[in-house]
A protein has these predicted regions:
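Substrate-binding clefts and catalytic carboxylate motifs of secreted carbohydrate-active enzymes
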Residues: 30-33, 41-44, 48-59, 63-184
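Active-site mouth of glycoside hydrolases
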Residues: 1-39, 43-46, 174
Length: 184
């Protein structure tokens, strides 16, 4: 996952790139050719050839993190016409029932050690609050926070999914991420 994208963040070593292409585009393809019912793509996201526009809408499989990591508005999805979207989403807190399995009432604070030990996204709590404040006032009671972040997450998924469904034939599928992530 995201192997080709990783190369854009590191020095381009032609030996490593050649080995990557040989393994993922040739050797693995050869090994699975007898399993014709199993679709195979060498990387996700994927353009039309190795290291080509793996975020372009017109080809392959895309990951779209402009909403969430890029703090774009939820309607950003409506400007995109991807062929297949295999990663997108928006984080929310788990239910209060789940929160009570890992935090005491005195730890009901996003900055507490109990919450920070579960937050795997750098700046994730700030991003959740950014999107929450786009729609709602910040809640006075912590117990309202999981519910409100869940509404924002649902709105994100709904907005994107409805757009992609309206474009069936152009967009042939989407997979959202961060829904029901493991918190306890």
């Amino acid at each position: 996952n995201e192997i080709e994208a990783m190369f854009s963040y590191m020095p381009r070593n032609s030996k490593i790139i050649k080995a990557y292409i040989e393994f993922f585009y040739h050797q693995l393809t050869e090994h699975i050719k007898d399993y014709l019912t199993v679709p195979y793509i060498p990387s996700s996201p994927l353009g039309d050839k190795p290291f080509s526009q793996n975020t372009a809408d017109g080809v392959g499989d895309t990951h779209m993190w402009n909403v969430w990591h890029g703090l774009k508005p939820l309607n950003y999805y409506e400007k995109r016409y991807t062929r297949f979207l295999s990663e997108f989403g928006l984080e929310s807190l788990p239910s209060m029932k789940a929160i009570k399995t890992f935090a005491t009432e005195s730890e009901f604070d996003l900055a507490s050690d109990a919450f920070m030990s579960h937050q795997k996204c750098e700046g994730g709590n700030e991003k959740m609050m950014f999107y929450l404040k786009e729609r709602f006032d910040a809640p006075i009671h912590f117990e309202d926070l999981p519910y409100l972040t869940g509404i924002v997450q649902a709105d994100c998924i709904e907005s994107a999914t409805l757009h992609f469904r309206r474009n069936k034939g152009r967009c042939n599928g989407s997979v959202f991420w961060q829904f029901n992530d493991v918190w306890n």
